[in-house]
Amino acid sequence: MERKIIVSVSGASGAVYAKVLFDKLLHIKQQVAKVGVVLSDNAKEVWKYELGNELYKDYPFDFYDKNDFMAPFASGSAKYDTMIICPCSMGTLGRIAGGISNDLTTRAADVILKERRKLILVARDTPYNLMSMNNMITVMEAGAMNCQVTQR
């Protein structure tokens, strides 16, 4: 079964995790019909700072502006299977937990949750404060999965 996947890269540090995810998606391209990507302005800056390049532009994915509410996955009728926010900043997590759909990332996350599809949040900002942990609980209760990563 070919999947349709949304990847959002927020402005949290950890651009290397987004790059690894992009590379893995290329590796399994025969199993993926579409990959739609949203990068926040901060994500673009962090990528350039941490990785020293802007090579995210070279990946053969469909890129969308952070404010493009006409992107297909801004609606449940597009039937994207999975959304991965990698890395997921605590600000993005908080907006999703609060139901605030103020950009394409948070709108798509809202759609994925209401359609009972898979939302994976790759939290990066550790240690967590109490508000962030409560936001994680809220999104998990709504059906999302939280995945913490650390560098080796």
Residue spans of the language-model regions?
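A cross-family phosphate/adenosyl-ligand binding-site feature
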Residues: 1-120, 126-152
